[in-house]
Amino acid sequence: MSSKLTNITERFDFEGTICEIKPLGEGLINDTYKVKTAETDKPDYVLQRINHHIFPNIEMVMHNIDAVTSHIRNSLAANETPYIDRRVLRFLPTKNDGKLYTMMDDGTYWRLMIYIDNAITKQNIDPENSREAGRAIGNFQKMLADIPVALGETIKNFHNMEFRLEQLYDVVKQDPIGRVKEER
């Protein structure tokens, strides 16, 4: 177990005793690790290095994430939705300043969240997964329709649905790998 990763994790206000830290998933942007705790009544965690080359304004990224997750969590609670902790990420504050991220001496940024057991990431794209992803994006947009705070733009046009739809329509027109032709 890496003492560096343990030291980073210990900056956060978490419960339990760290017994293992190992890579998690196949992410392309951030480095992600599962932090396992020794106690069965304590959660496991996800430790993630935020790629500050992709997201140079870490403060804004974490403000957005906090605003979005808090709003969705509150909306689900108001509707008495079950299993909220399985539906919404929960980030932990640091011990020293209460921020939802920490910056290390080497200039890297890290965050810690509760691990959602048995969550899966689909690696293959098929029509059923695409429909489910579309439904999920639609539900996400619907849940944020009444968010009371402004979100900052961390990547130009990243959350601009009109721009994303135009990109989709352009790709459908171009059909670069022949999928549209196959479906007709």
For each predicted feature, which ranges?
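Conserved NTP-binding catalytic cores of kinases and kinase-like/nucleotidyltransferase enzymes
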Residues: 1-100, 104-107
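Short amphipathic C-terminal alpha-helix that caps PH/PH-like domains
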Residues: 65, 133-140
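Protein kinase-like catalytic domain
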Residues: 73, 141-148
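ATP-dependent phospho-/nucleotidyl transfer catalytic cores
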Residues: 22-26, 48-59, 116-131, 135, ...
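Conserved structural core of kinase catalytic domains
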Residues: 90-132
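Broad hydrophobic/π-residue packing in well-ordered secondary structure
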Residues: 11-15, 33, 108-116, 159-165
